[in-house]
From Swiss-Prot:
Disulfide bonds: none annotated. This is Archaemetzincin. Its cofactor is Zn(2+). The gene is amzA. Keywords: Hydrolase, Metal-binding, Metalloprotease, Protease, Zinc. The active site is at 111 (proton acceptor). The lineage of its organism: Archaea, Nanobdellota, Candidatus Nanoarchaeia, Nanoarchaeales, Nanoarchaeaceae. Zn(2+) 1 binds at residues 110, 114, 120. Monomer. Belongs to the peptidase M54 family. GO terms for biological process: proteolysis. InterPro entries: MetalloPept_cat_dom_sf, Pept_M54_archaemetzincn, Pept_M54_archaemetzncn_arc/bac.
Amino acid sequence: MLLYLVNFQSMWANYVLELLKDAFAFKIKAKELDIPLAAYNPFRKQFSAQLLLDYVVERYKDGLVFAIIDEDIYDSNYNFVFGLAYPFRGAIVSTYRLKNFERIKKEVLHEMGHVFGLGHCNNYCVMRFSNSVFEVDEKPDKYCENCYREILNNGFYVNPKYVIFKENYN
């Protein structure tokens, strides 16, 4: 896996690198990448998540990619997004609105779930859709058993410590 740090000088970078290694046992190469100016929308004062992710996946064709950025990002259907993913290809997460380790962890795990082929989940699960930081705070930092099984069935690995097993439900 290639981790892109998009114009990113921050404590979050090492945290995300270690999280990806621990959660998914990836061998990771980290590179810094400049933000493409074409991805900036001056009317919205935000970057297009889709254009950024397209830019990142075009530069690395040999495996999965993950990008982290500390800029506000949006997708065409939303005022903002925390991240965006392409199944079986790559993802981007913005720390701009998340601002703390727990939220960033949840959104990294969430977007990687999409990379592994998952959709949104209605269970008590990190794959639950979040439209606000409050909703991010309310969801767990783990996959439910159903999502875990689907990830494994799609040929990927998740460290079981990032899974809520039924016997541990409250």
